[in-house]
Amino acid sequence: MNRKKLLRLGIVLYSLCIVCFCFTPQPQLPTGVETPGIQTIGRLVFLLTPFNSLWNLGEVTSPIQLFWIFLQNALNVLLLFPLIFQFLFLIPSLRKTKRVILLSFLLSLSIECTQLVLDFFFDFNRVFEIDDLWTNTLGGYLAWILYKLLHRTR
């Protein structure tokens, strides 16, 4: 299998992982773990405070809650990293900072909006988070930086 076919397969498989991770019903949080700053409209759930994890850090009541918040942010940074990294190898026209940031942001916004639609129709217990937009976009940007670093040494 040549490199382009392998990259395409990787993109398809990782996209399926994103679908499973982001668009399936989310279980309730473990007992004692709550996210500060949550707002609800009907069964739609929003976290619209930018940098919510930092602003509401004083409301964290346990080490488990603190770990959960850190883990959630770290996973959001990593969510689009592999996908964007593979796109960079496959699509030369994407290899500009503005394009990477725009694609990462639009993918993240699409994920968040799709979660809202799924919650509206099927009550999947998902949350539209402003912080997901910037953390996912940061992950795409970090993929771009790694790509540039790897190609600088060639």
Regions found by a protein language model. Give the residues of each.
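Alpha-helical transmembrane segments of polytopic membrane proteins
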Residues: Q72-A74, D132-N136
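Non-cytosolic membrane-interface motifs at loop->transmembrane helix junctions
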Residues: F124-L133
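Bulky hydrophobic segments
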Residues: M1-N125, Y141-R154
